[in-house]
Design a protein with these regions (language model features):
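Cyclophilin-like peptidyl-prolyl cis-trans isomerases
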Residues: 20-232
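Secretory targeting signatures
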Residues: 1-23
Length: 232
């Protein structure tokens, strides 16, 4: 069963890669009508973070109960100033914007434990547009790098939806993907630990900047600081 799911995810990856070349640099951020937790506004007691960049602020809600390691790592790094001055070193339009590497090369960064930590997957967290997720180089290799999904809304075709259903994604998840857009090919490969609830337009603005042949922005996009707080 696992091999079949992996094969289907590979097919979704191919289709999504083709669709990435068919985008416009304008995005209509429609309201998503879904009971999935990533589309709820932060409530009292939730941990939130404001990623302050030189292009604007991106506000995310974090999910420590479902991804405790990833959240602890991100929050501790943020509070220690680890991400201050770090660039978005990898920007791919209609896919992701990636940061968290102090070296700015895509090869650097470490966890707060100075070792890679385990993946944390959940049926409740997925790579919808606006998802905050851990970058990795394979299974259980999470360190400090993270990305935000910036796939175009309405980008989930009937073909992709059918493949997702065949692989076992719940109907509610598929419906949410169809409304919000996203990158389902990243599910169960990367740890989702947060979701943008305000400032998604800033993430899209970053995704539209001009890049070189290595997907690096030609003009630096920088995280000035990340402020973490708990909703009262």
């Amino acid at each position: 069963m696992k091999k079949r799911v992996i094969a289907i995810i590979a097919c979704i990856t191919v289709i999504c890669s083709v669709l990435c070349g068919c985008v416009q640099q304008t995005v209509n951020l429609a309201r998503v009508e879904s009971g999935e937790m990533q589309f709820a506004q932060p409530a009292s007691g939730d941990t939130v973070a404001v990623i302050k960049t030189n292009m604007g602020d991106i506000k995310v809600v974090l999910y420590p109960k479902l991804a405790p390691l990833a959240v602890e790592n991100f929050v501790t790094h943020a509070q220690n100033g680890y991400y201050n001055g770090v660039t978005f070193h990898r920007v791919i339009e209609d896919f992701v914007i990636q940061s968290g590497d102090p070296e700015g090369t895509g090869n650097g960064g470490n966890s707060i434990w100075q070792l890679p930590f385990s993946d944390e997957f959940s049926d409740k967290l997925h790579h919808y547009t606006g998802a905050l997720s851990m970058a990795n180089s394979g299974e259980d290799t999470n360190r400090s790098q993270f990305f935000i999904v910036t796939s175009q809304p309405k980008g989930i075709t009937d073909e992709i939806a059918a493949l997702m259903a065949e692989a076992g994604w719940r109907a509610e998840i598929i419906d949410a993907y169809r409304q919000a857009g996203g990158a389902p090919n990243l599910d169960y490969r990367h740890t989702v630990f947060g979701q943008v609830y305000d400032g998604l337009e800033i993430a899209f603005d970053i995704s539209f900047v001009k890049t070189d042949e290595n997907d690096r922005p030609k003009e630096a996009v920088v995280i000035e600081t990340i402020e973490v707080s708990v909703v009262e």
